[in-house]
Amino acid sequence: MSKEIPTPYMWSYQPQMGLAAGAAQDYSTRINYMSAGPHMISRVNGIRAHRNRILLEQAAITTTPRNNLNPRSWPAALVYQESPAPTTVVLPRDAQAEVQMTNSGAQLAGGFRHRVRSPGQGITHLTIRGRGIQLNDESVSSSLGLRPDGTFQIGGAGRPSFTPRQAILTLQTSSSEPRSGGIGTLQFIEEFVPSVYFNPFSGPPGHYPDQFIPNFDAVKDSADGYD
């Protein structure tokens, strides 16, 4: 009975390539029942068989069906596209420029701004011109002037997504093309559930997975010393 209940193969992760670096049986998880009686041995075998059933069910749920157990390059459609954490930027505030925007009715799109040098002076003044138009708003406001706090709504309608007192801009980056190749640690845990391999040494040697051989090389995708 105990020989028919295999010890699962635990997969290891190759972080540089994002691949599985092979699997080995973890005999440290086996319960020592050498001095136990038949009743205890039967209970231990029942626990081991139940564990293997759980692993088989988990593999059926989380593992992606594929011909190659450990592909060298995962297609983008099968790779988790992890979004990087957003970046928070503190916006600079220029009280003098905001007052000039309000007084001049600055326009967000169109118009222009230029610097005027006063005759006989070396000081450059910032001049902003516009018509005080708020862009793309479904509701018509009674006042067409810009807000005195310098907060503008460029697109959409309704209330802006930030407050004047919260001068913080959150940026979310994303890649222009989906990533392919190796997989991350989270996907590795789901894809490479501990393997339950029944009767591993009953068939021809060529049918035994290379990944289960101790000297398997993940870089060469082969086991050293084996053809």
Swiss-Prot record:
Which UniProt keywords are given for this protein, alphabetically ordered? Capsid protein, Host nucleus, Late protein, Phosphoprotein, Virion
Instruction: Give residues where Phosphothreonine occurs.
Output: T64
Keyword Lyase found: no
Per the entry, induction is: Expressed in the late phase of the viral replicative cycle.
**Further details from the record:** All late proteins expressed from the major late promoter are produced by alternative splicing and alternative polyadenylation of the same gene giving rise to non-overlapping ORFs. A leader sequence is present in the N-terminus of all these mRNAs and is recognized by the viral shutoff protein to provide expression although conventional translation via ribosome scanning from the cap has been shut off in the host cell.
Q: Which family does it belong to?
A: Belongs to the adenoviridae hexon-linking protein family.
Subunit structure of this entry? Answer: Interacts with the peripentonal hexons as well as the hexons in the facets. Part of a complex composed of the core-capsid bridging protein, the endosome lysis protein VI and the hexon-linking protein VIII; these interactions bridge the virus core to the capsid.
Name of the molecule in the record: Pre-hexon-linking protein VIII
